C-alpha cells in the first residue's frame, strides 16, 4: 500500500528537480487582503512578457531551468504582507508595481532590493532571509512546519514532504494498534478541554453501532481567532490525513469538516484537498487496497459562537438549530444522528500525521512536563 505514496513522492521530486528557481507568494487571508493574488498574477504576466520559462504547477511538462511561481499558506508575518520569497530572499509589503524590478534584479541578476527587505526596528538592520528576522528565529514549528512553504492546493507537494506516510503506517498496523500509538503519544484535545485523544477514539471504537462518524471542529468562536484557520488554509492535507487516520481507527464510515462560512478560503482549500484525495485513491472505496471505505464532506457553520460546543456543533451539522444538549450521553455513545461520533479540533487532527510519521516517542519530546502534559505551541 506504500507503493502509491512512494511513487507519487518520487515522481514529484523528479519533476521538481527541473525547477531552477521558486517564487513563493503568500496566499494567506491577510496577504490576499493586501493584494497578494494580484502580485501572484503579475509575476506570471511578467514572465510571459519576457518569454521566460515558468510553471504554476509541478507536472511532467515542466521545462528545465524554469521558475515555479507558487502560492503558499499564511507565513505568519501578516503585518508585513504581501510577502514574497525568491529562493531564500524574503521581501515584504510587495506591490504589483514591484514585480518587474524583482524579476529584473533578483531573478535575473541575483541582486537584493534593500527597500523590500524587512528592517529590524531594534538595530535598523535589513533582514535578507526569513531566518534573519527576530520574529522567526526562535520558532520551532511542528504543525505549521510546512505552512508558508508548500503549495496548499497541491497534494503531490504534500506527499513530497512526507505527507500520507502516517496514513500508510496506520493502515499497516491496524485500528487497535493505531489507537495504542495515539495513547502512547499522550496527545490531548487541542480545543481546550484536553481530553486524551487516544482514549476518545477507543471509546468510540468500542461503542455499539453499525455507523460511526468523525467531525472536525473548524469553528473558532473567539473573534479574531486565526490559528485553526491558518492551518486549514495553509496545510489542509495535514488535517485531511488526520481525519482519515481517525476514521480508520474509530471505525467511522464518514467524516465531516464543520467550518464556519466566514472562512471561504479555508473551505475552498479543504475541498480541493478532499477532491484530490478521491482522485488519488485516498478517499472513497477500498482505500489503498485495504478494504477501508471512508468519505469526507464539508458542512458550513453559520458563525454562531455556541456551535464551538460539541453537542451544539452536532445539532448544526444535522441541519438543526445549534443548541447544546445535556451530557450524558456523550458523543462517543450517541452523537451525529444518534450514532457514535468523535469530534476533534483542527490542531488535534493535524498532530496525528506527525505522530505516525515521527513516532509517539518523538512527539512526546515536545510535551510540557506535568500532570496535564500537552504539546507546546506549534
Write out the residue ranges for each language-model feature.
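Feature of Fe-S/electron-transfer and energy-metabolism proteins
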Residues: 1-378
Amino acid at each position: 500500500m506504500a507503493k502509491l505514496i512512494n511513487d507519487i513522492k518520487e515522481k514529484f521530486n523528479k519533476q521538481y528537480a527541473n525547477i531552477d528557481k521558486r517564487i513563493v507568494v503568500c496566499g494567506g487571508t491577510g496577504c490576499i487582503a493586501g493584494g497578494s493574488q494580484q502580485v501572484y498574477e503579475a509575476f506570471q504576466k511578467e514572465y510571459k512578457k519576457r518569454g521566460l520559462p515558468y510553471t504554476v504547477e509541478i507536472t511532467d511538462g515542466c521545462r528545465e531551468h524554469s521558475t515555479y511561481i507558487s502560492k503558499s499558506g499564511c507565513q505568519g508575518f501578516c503585518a508585513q504582507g504581501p510577502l514574497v520569497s525568491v529562493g531564500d530572499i524574503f521581501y515584504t509589503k510587495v506591490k504589483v508595481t514591484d514585480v518587474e524590478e524583482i524579476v529584473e534584479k533578483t531573478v535575473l541578476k541575483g541582486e537584493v532590493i534593500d527597500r523590500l527587505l524587512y528592517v529590524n526596528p531594534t538595530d535598523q538592520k535589513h533582514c535578507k532571509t526569513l531566518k534573519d528576522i527576530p520574529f522567526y528565529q526562535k520558532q520551532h514549528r511542528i504543525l505549521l512546519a510546512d505552512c508558508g512553504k508548500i503549495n496548499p492546493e497541491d497534494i503531490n507537494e504534500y506527499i513530497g514532504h512526507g505527507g500520507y506516510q502516517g496514513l500508510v503506517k496506520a493502515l499497516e498496523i491496524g485500528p487497535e494498534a493505531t489507537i495504542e500509538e495515539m495513547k502512547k503519544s499522550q496527545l490531548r484535545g487541542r480545543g481546550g478541554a484536553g481530553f486524551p485523544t487516544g482514549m476518545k477514539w477507543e471509546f468510540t471504537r468500542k461503542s455499539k453501532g453499525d455507523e460511526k462518524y468523525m467531525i472536525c471542529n473548524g469553528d473558532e468562536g473567539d473573534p479574531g481567532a486565526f490559528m485553526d484557520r491558518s492551518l486549514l488554509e495553509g496545510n489542509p492535507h495535514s488535517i485531511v490525513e488526520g481525519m482519515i487516520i481517525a476514521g480508520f481507527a474509530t471505525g467511522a464510515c464518514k467524516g465531516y469538516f464543520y467550518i464556519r462560512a466566514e472562512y471561504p478560503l479555508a473551505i475552498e482549500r479543504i475541498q480541493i484537498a478532499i477532491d484530490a484525495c478521491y482522485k488519488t485513491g485516498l478517499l472513497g472505496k477500498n482505500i489503498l487496497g485495504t478494504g477501508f471505505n471512508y468519505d469526507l464532506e464539508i458542512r458550513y457553520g453559520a458563525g454562531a459562537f455556541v456551535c464551538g460546543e460539541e453537542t451544539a456543533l452536532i445539532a448544526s451539522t444535522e441541519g438543526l438549530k445549534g443548541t447544546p444538549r445535556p451530557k450524558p450521553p456523550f458523543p462517543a455513545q450517541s452523537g451525529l444522528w444518534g450514532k457514535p461520533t468523535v469530534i476533534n479540533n483542527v490542531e488535534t487532527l493535524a498532530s496525528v500525521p506527525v505522530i505516525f510519521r515521527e513516532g509517539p516517542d518523538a512527539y512526546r519530546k515536545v510535551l510540557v512536563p506535568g500532570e496535564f502534559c500537552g504539546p507546546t505551541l506549534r
